[in-house]
Structures are given as C-alpha cells and as structure tokens.
Amino acid sequence: MVAGGFGAGKTTLVGAVSEIRPLRTEELLSEAGQLVDDTGGVDQKTTTTVAMDFGRITIRSGLSLYLFGTPGQDRFWFLWDELSQGALGAVVLADTRRLEDCFPAVDYFEHRRIPFVVAVNCFSGARTYAEEDVARALDLDRGTPVVLCDARDRASGKDVLIRMVEYAGRMHTARLLESVGQGAGPE
C-alpha cells in the first residue's frame, strides 16, 4: 500500500515506479470537495484519487509488488481495510509542509501491525528535515525507517519500495521467531 495525506504524491509514486500502465481513479477537484478537503499547501492540486491507484513493479526475479495507492481524504478511509488485505507492508508518503497529515496512516498501520516505512517526498520549496527529526515528530516506533525521496523519480521510488520490503521481511521474521519462542515450553 502507498498511503499518506492529501497531495503527498501517492499517485505520482505509483505511476513513477509501475512497470505496467497504472490504473488511476483521478477526478477533478470539485467546488463541493473544496469545502471538505484541506488544500492548504497544495494549492496547485487540481485532481484527487477517488478510489485507488494500482501498479506493479518487479523488485527482483520472483518478487513483484502490487501497488495500491490509497485516497488521501478521510471520507475514503473505508477503502483502506479492503486494500490492506494481505499487504506485505506499506509506504507512508509524507510532505513536510503538512506532516500532521501522516498521523492517520501511521496509526492505521501501527494498529494493524503492518510494517511500514515513511518516505518523505522532497517537494521543491519545502524545508528539508533530517530523517531522525521526522521520526521524532511522527513519534515512530524505534527502527521504523524514514527515507527521503522524490516521488517523480523511478529510481528513488524503487529505493523506497526496496527499503519497505527489507523492513517488512525483518519484521515478519522477528514475529515468526517470537511466535515460535512463545510456543516452546519446557519439555
């Protein structure tokens, strides 16, 4: 899954890394939507995802990721439970101009124990922060990766996905070992 706040670059990231033509459900922002959606900081945004984005990328032979980009607005969160079924992990795309928009996605993945990385989309003109400062501001669990990226750049997006796969692999292994350790008792 690729999640994050409104205008953080989720559609852009899925489109940049997908090796197939991405499925997009973009619609023009309406006047009615402007009353509901906070467009502060993303004034140039003219479209929004109304269902999901879908793409696919092969990380290496035998490992393809199906990418589901979530809508950024609260009113579409009911879709997240369906999109997260069977998820290996997630990317929370962050815009430092609206960092507070990440909290719902961070909370969602933490609550469901879905491994995730935070990818800070480095918009031009936005202040750049150190990864540890972003982790502290988002109150992330120790070890949750934070990476800087450019969602428009395929190589940068692929690096984010590789970090997510590596982290998810470590988390799944740790949980497996934990469950095996808990199941073993004295003989």
Per-region residue spans from a language model:
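A general structural detector for well-ordered alpha-helical segments in enzyme core domains, enriched
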Residues: 105-108, 133-134
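A short helix->loop->beta-strand "cap" motif at the edges of active sites that frequently abuts
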Residues: 112-115, 143
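Canonical P-loop GTPase G-domain recognition
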Residues: 124-179, 187
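Conserved beta-strand segments of the P-loop GTPase G domain that flank and frequently precede/overlap
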Residues: 67-70, 90-96, 118-122, 148-150
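Conserved G1/Walker A P-loop phosphate-binding module
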Residues: 1-46, 55-66
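Inter-motif core of Ras-like GTPase G domains
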Residues: 73-98, 107-112
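Short secondary-structure boundary/capping elements
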Residues: 49, 71-76, 97-101, 129
